[in-house]
Amino acid sequence: MRLLFLAVLRPHTGNAVTAQRVRAHLEAAGHVCVLKDAFDFESRSEIANLILAENCEAALALHLYRGGRLLQGHRIPFGVIFGGTDVNEDANQAEKNTVMGRVLEEARFAVAFTESMKEMAQAQWPHAKGKVYVQSQGIATTPNAAFNWNTFLQRSEINQSADNLHIFLLICGLRQVKDPLYLVDAFSAWHQEEPNVHLVIVGPEVDPVFTREVKAKVKRAAGVRLIGEMPQEDLHAVVKNCFAVVNSSVSEGMSAAILEAMDLEVPVLARNIPGNAAVVKHEVTGLLFSNPQEFVHLAKRLVSDPALEKEIVVNGREYVRMYHSWQVERDTYQQLIRKLEGSTED
């Protein structure tokens, strides 16, 4: 089949990585997948023209509101994949909620990353029961073997002997929902006690106004550095070399950065929110914190307790292999896409 796939494709963001992975799964099954950025289109008529021009027989959208609403009413079957903001944010706005409900009426299937996301969706839109499937994100990491860690440290202006360094890595697009400033004050105070600990924030400048605020704050914060977006393979190499990966988001669908850290055998400290608690079991596959002070307490514990670090790393890796298999994800999407075959009158 020729499929139109609409997603939010800001480079080096979780959505873009997910979309590229799903496209690869579908193309491996022999489908042609026309991947387009939902933000490039304003109206359904533009999508109608695109469907005609590309001769698309079916469609898929990552994000019900941003992508799915553009696929309605074209008389081609489509499926949707929930994004984190769909159920965590957009569903709380009456107008968007109604739009997403209509999208689900027309969609042949919907994919949620977690069981709790599925439950939230079915509570919001009871008519979607039976249409929502759970498929967690499949994880495959590809660290750049030629990546130079010392050059990265210099670029981050961290000039110390690399032996006793503890680099905590926060990977996120600079926007408010990711809350990159949540830990900055507490971390900076810790760095002043222990100068070998550093927090490096890596990610694209998504929200220009908020980015200015982040840059201004980080500039004044000892022990905290901000680095722009990086190619996926380089980012995986940075993760592999750092001491721990941190997530301080206000809400998450399913953080690929957390799962990739587990896959690369690096401990994870994550803010205790439903999306993170769905993948991080406290003191088993990672550590969960509820405030900046607790983060520092847990980070200090991790630094001083190699046995805890080892246990978390082993369990995290096992968890990803068991529940986030790339092959299982491939099989699921290749099966679901068959629901789009056949006429729209089925």
From Swiss-Prot:
The keyword Signal applies. It comes from the Eukaryota. One of its GO terms (molecular function) is glycosyltransferase activity. It is found in: Secreted. Its EC number is 2.4.-.-. One of its GO terms (cellular component) is extracellular region. It is an enzyme of class 2 (transferase). Residues 1-16 form the signal peptide. CDD domains: GT4_PimA-like (cd03801). The keyword ATP-binding does not apply. Keywords: Glycosyltransferase, Secreted, Signal, Transferase. Belongs to the glycosyltransferase group 1 family. Glycosyltransferase 4 subfamily. PANTHER family: GLYCOSYLTRANSFERASE 1 DOMAIN-CONTAINING PROTEIN 1, PTHR46660. This is Glycosyltransferase 1 domain-containing protein 1. It comes from Homo sapiens. The gene is GLT1D1.
